[in-house]
């Protein structure tokens, strides 16, 4: 018998139809049962706020406050890294015209703002560890049509090159974290080049890391064929990395990293799992969906400056009569933020000049219209008074497109930015939590008596 296949073997459609019918006939959970039993689906309270599942010093996400009766009071959003409001970091970046993502990495990992000497030394360490281990290209040689899946495989592959992969000491986990933060941009670009060659039948090229470059500069330099980019482009990418670096312990991918870390597993397994969580369209994959929806709206709206026409098309999207049929306006709404998402506010402000300079004003203005019109449409269509604000995904896809970045690495860029946060939370979980995360599930199945196979 030959077990070799060029592709994953698929089961016969008729067989699968029968198996699915068998599953549906024997499995159902009524959503009302969850409410009756007080189950917090999605680890959410009835008012949409998250269930308190842990403590952290790494990051605070502020989108509301509660009054004495426990009612949610919407507030302008704030994102706090280790006690520092990210708006202060952004202001510093533009006031003194410097890259700040590396400073944020230090801040998230260690809890303090680095002085000049510490920052310079740390940037040098990152630069020295951007290159992949000798022989690692063998791992890269098996391409994937999805770069997120390839990133997972690459991260897991590093385990084989680490003599201390299972060492859970603080020193070793921090060392592994810094290595991952430094090398993942190189993995991403190389994985993209392999995908271009194998799946897209296009030329691929590999550029060696240049010393002295920031992470944003390194990405643009190794991604672009001619290695050329403007300072403004690199600064805008630096902003994208900064605002995506962490978002508290409860978001899906970070909580995934914490769950795996609580089991005592290795760093590579924990971060690979977080990448898998981020890939999902309900989490990190949303930035790609936003940009695809933007192109669809511009294709079907004759006059982008006509609010009534835009409003009507957005209404059709919500009714599942247009777009991808999901009924979602991507880039709108957030689990925590109510009035505003500070990350979206930053990217919207910083992207405007480049959008007009590069001829993307129509796309930029349409996103502004969506942000302005969508909340009212939500209220009309859903009958809800809950405030809805734009989220970070609304402008990030447009920014990547303005930078000439392929849709293939929109979400991988999110992963590159979020690795420092994942690692900071992993360290915190391993060092301080010291207990495996193990929530309860209530069994709803009906008791069956085992029957011999002859009696079935």
Where are these regions (language model features)?
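Non-transmembrane, aqueous-exposed alpha-helical and coiled segments at domain scale
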Residues: 1-456
């Amino acid at each position: 018998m030959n077990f070799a296949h060029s592709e994953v073997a698929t089961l016969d459609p008729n067989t699968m139809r029968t198996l699915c019918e068998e599953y549906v006939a024997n499995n159902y959970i009524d959503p009302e049962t969850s409410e009756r039993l007080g189950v917090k689906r999605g680890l959410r309270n009835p008012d949409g706020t998250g269930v308190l599942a842990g403590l952290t010093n790494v990051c605070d996400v502020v989108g509301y406050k509660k009054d004495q009766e426990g009612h949610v009071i919407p507030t302008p959003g704030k994102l706090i890294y280790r006690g520092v409001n990210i708006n202060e970091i952004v202001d510093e970046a533009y006031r003194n015209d410097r890259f700040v993502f590396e400073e944020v990495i230090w801040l998230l990992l260690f809890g303090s703002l680095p002085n000049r000497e510490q920052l310079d030394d740390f940037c040098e360490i990152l630069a020295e560890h951007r290159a992949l281990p000798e022989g690692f290209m063998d791992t890269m040689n098996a391409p994937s049509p999805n770069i997120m899946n390839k990133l997972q495989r690459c991260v897991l592959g590093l385990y084989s090159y680490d003599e201390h992969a299972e060492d859970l000491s603080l020193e070793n986990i921090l060392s592994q974290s810094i290595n991952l933060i430094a090398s993942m941009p190189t993995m991403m670009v190389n994985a993209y080049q392999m995908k271009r060659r194998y799946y897209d039948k296009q030329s691929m090229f590999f550029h060696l890391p240049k010393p002295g470059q920031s992470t944003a500069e390194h990405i643009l330099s190794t991604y672009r064929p001619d290695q050329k980019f403007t300072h403004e482009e690199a600064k805008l990418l630096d902003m994208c990395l900064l605002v995506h670096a962490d978002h508290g312990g409860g978001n899906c991918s970070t909580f995934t990293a914490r769950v795996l870390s609580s089991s005592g597993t290795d760093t590579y397994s924990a971060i690979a799992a977080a990448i898998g969580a981020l890939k999902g369209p309900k989490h990190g994959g949303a930035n790609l969906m936003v940009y695809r929806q933007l192109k669809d709206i511009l294709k079907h709206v004759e006059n982008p400056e006509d609010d009534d026409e835009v409003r009507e098309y957005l209404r059709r999207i919500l009714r599942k009569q247009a777009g991808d049929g999901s009924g979602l306006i991507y880039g709108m709404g957030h689990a925590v933020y109510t009035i505003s998402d500070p990350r979206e506010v930053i990217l919207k402000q910083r992207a405007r000049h480049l959008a007009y300079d590069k001829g993307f004003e129509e796309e930029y203005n349409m996103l502004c219209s969506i942000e302005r019109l969508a909340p009212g449409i939500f209220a009309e269509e859903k009958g809800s008074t809950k405030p809805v604000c734009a989220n970070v995904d609304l402008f990030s896809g447009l920014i990547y497109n303005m930078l000439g970045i392929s849709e293939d690495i929109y979400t991988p860029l999110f992963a590159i930015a979020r690795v420092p946060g994942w690692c900071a939370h992993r360290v915190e979980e391993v060092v301080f939590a010291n207990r495996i995360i193990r929530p309860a599930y209530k069994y709803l199945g009906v008791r069956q008596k085992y029957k011999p196979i002859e009696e079935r």
